[in-house]
């Protein structure tokens, strides 16, 4: 049928896919120059919203199928280690009209790594600014639960790689640590949290500035400690010992509170900073995939020059964008159109003709 009363299914599909990447003005120009379609902004927005509403309910199952397909690909390829399912989440500030308190959009990634430590693919989730990021957490939990419930292959290494911000920490403690193992009734899944190595390095830099002040000494010590943190067993404790000894011997150039803040961050999160062991197992130690998702999901589409968004106007674009970036657009589109196809019943053919 006609989508939103204005577009054929083929045109609506084209508009929806382009809207996930192009600005409104760019898309209207493309429609006019390539398709001889002259629309106004209201018609465009109505079509995009209708397509997002139609596609979104089918996105979840397509993402589940995509992750399961990647897991099977990893299983078929073989290798010396476990297949890895790696999850991350992060946030990015968005230019939202009329919203003073909550402006942080949130994204999550679910990636599959081969037994050799190579990333095979990623699916993306996104949420416009929302208090406590409840919708993103629910969507991510549903995706992980369905994937792990349907996977009957080789055991997986489950990794959660984030910074140690409030939302990532709360999700690990309240959801992942309590996630039941579908293969072991009454048991729990063993998620390994890895605090992003590069965030940890920022705190080493802070310690260097407080201990030495600006200059070569601070740079050299921080570089050495970053290598120690990454390459040595118990690296974080070596860093803490070195910082403590230097403080006792030479005192501090900077503020005591700055030293305590950086030192306590490393000490508090030390159980999730065993980077040498993670590297040995070919587990990623940085949240680069999720950091990049903040840019690909949000920045490249929502933070162009002069842009301001409303929550409701941004949601359809975001829904379409995560479907496109996850590489499941054809599957979702076909599922939508198949669900709306009505077969015309065949009338019985009489063997004799009445006159």
Predicted regions and their residues:
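Catalytic center-proximal scaffold of phosphoryl-transfer enzymes
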Residues: 1-355
